[in-house]
Amino acid sequence: MGLLSEFKAFAVKGNVVDMAVGIIIGAAFGKIVSSFVGDVIMPPIGLLIGGVDFSDLAITLKAAEGDVPAVVLAYGKFIQTVLDFVIVAFAIFMGVKAINRLKREEAVAPSEPPVPSAEETLLTEIRDLLKAQQNKS
């Protein structure tokens, strides 16, 4: 099997395609969460604690000199990134929890007993007839 045909067989497998779709959706979800945290969550929090814009919070380690930019420790962006992570982790946790609950409900649901075969039905009838004859005597 040639290299190209092996690659084609690998690339069109369901798991690889599903994984690629998951990665793309995950990246888009990450952007949505980042926007949600930066544009919706952080401004009210900043307002509540005195009008602070978290994205601007930083400690200047070395001031800018000429063409050399300042060296800063941007801890406000780090706080936003941590909040992004917490929200994504919580969303994934809730999704996994819901899937696990569905799996448990599916496993707990009682399955119907198998329908007896014609042979089993016949043997049951014979047994019942023999018991009935035995009880008469």
From Swiss-Prot:
Pfam families, sorted: MscL (PF01741)
Domain of life the protein comes from: Bacteria
Broad class of the protein's primary localization: membrane
Its membrane topology: Multi-pass membrane protein
A single cellular component GO annotation: plasma membrane
Gene Ontology biological process terms in this record: monoatomic ion transport
SUPFAM superfamilies: Gated mechanosensitive channel (SSF81330)
Cellular location(s): Cell inner membrane
InterPro entries, alphabetized: Mechanosensitive_channel_CS (IPR019823), MS_channel (IPR001185), MSC/AndL (IPR037673), MscL_channel (IPR036019)
Keywords: Cell inner membrane, Cell membrane, Ion channel, Ion transport, Membrane, Transmembrane, Transmembrane helix, Transport
Molecular function GO terms recorded: mechanosensitive monoatomic ion channel activity
Keyword Ion transport: yes
Transmembrane annotation, as ranges: 9-29, 79-99
Protein family membership: Belongs to the MscL family.
Self-association and partners: Homopentamer.
Function description: Channel that opens in response to stretch forces in the membrane lipid bilayer. May participate in the regulation of osmotic pressure changes within the cell.
Name of the protein: Large-conductance mechanosensitive channel
Source organism (scientific name): Pseudomonas aeruginosa (strain ATCC 15692 / DSM 22644 / CIP 104116 / JCM 14847 / LMG 12228 / 1C / PRS 101 / PAO1)
Gene that specifies this protein: mscL
